[in-house]
From Swiss-Prot:
It comes from the Archaea. This is Tubulin-like protein CetZ5. Involved in cell shape control. InterPro entries: CetZ, CetZ_C, FtsZ/CetZ, Tubulin/FtsZ-like_C, Tubulin/FtsZ_GTPase_sf, Tubulin_CS, Tubulin_FtsZ_GTPase. It is found in: Cytoplasm. It holds the Pfam family Tubulin. Keywords: Cell shape, Cytoplasm, GTP-binding, Nucleotide-binding. One of its GO terms (biological process) is cell division.
Amino acid sequence: MKVLCFGMGQAGGNVLDALLRYEQRTNADYVVDAVAYNTASADLRGLDLVPEENRILFGADEVSGHGVGADNELAAELAERDSRQLLRGTDGAPTSTADAFLIFAGLGGGTGSGAAPVLAKHLNRIYEQPIYGVGILPAADEGALYSRNAARSLKALVDVTDHVFAFDNGAWAESGEDVAQAHDTMNEVLVRRLGILFASGEVAESGTVAESVVDSSEVINTLRGGGISTIGYAASELPESDGGGGFSIKGLLGGDSSSTDELDSINRITTQTRKAVLGQLTLPCDVDSASRGLVVVSGPPEWLNRKAVERSRTWVEEQTGSMEVRGGDYPLSESNHVGVLVLLGDVSRSDRVAEIRSTAVEAEQNRRERIASDAADREDGTEAVVDDRLDSLF
């Protein structure tokens, strides 16, 4: 699946950079072009792999390249004002070769939170391809303001995109971990899942073709209808002697290695499917609230047992209660792992999303009460120095 990628704000740009790095490392080819936007020039300079000419600073006349802080309303206003400048990011891009457009953004801060929905709206107005958001939710300890920003931005992004891939920082943060290292680790978790999803329909360098291909239409159909999705992934390392060669001790001793390998393959694949869904989702949720699903099993071709792939697909069907769960395999001849990726589309119940919304509502109520209180205080202070019995000087 070919994607044209946009990174909005600091977090969005960093995740985009991480995806490009992962694509290079895995010798894949699914990103047709990459564009980064920011209101802070320093954040654009900090990127490594997004081409220099594709790093676009906007809102400079208002904030002079220093960013908007956590003011996502200002970011949205600047993005709307500079919308033509944002769209120039697609001028040199091979848009016709892209199956979909992807917008990365941290939803708790300012620039990404406010400007990502604006960019999505304008791309939707011009292009036929589906527009997907990748929304990074703040952890609970990042504060009420970030939750308020995230709740408003997530709602806006869902409204103007064809689907939103959600990633919950709070679910993946390790206590005591260095902040920069934590973000790098979480970015890697996210881009590995997206990279496998997008690469799974491509023909491998070895020329090996999947028995059940997961092409772009399968992904697009899983995401149709809008909403929020979550992605799980789990992998099992193969024994060193089996890492792609199909060698086994039982075969060496004259036994039937194929039956042993088949049983091992089935066990590994079904176990990793359960792990992916029950503990490795980018956004923890009620699995039975998903409307659709997609299962992709990757690894050396001889380990991709059709029976196991079908069992895994059926199990996800049972867990979600959906009859729209697709399945396929992604052969990787040089891999020493068997991995399972599970995409759950249109998830309607997530405790973390509900918590963010609740915190946001409370923060908004507190904000309005403070505004009303400040206005009353100003009025009281004015009465102390103003006497209506005196004529105005002007």
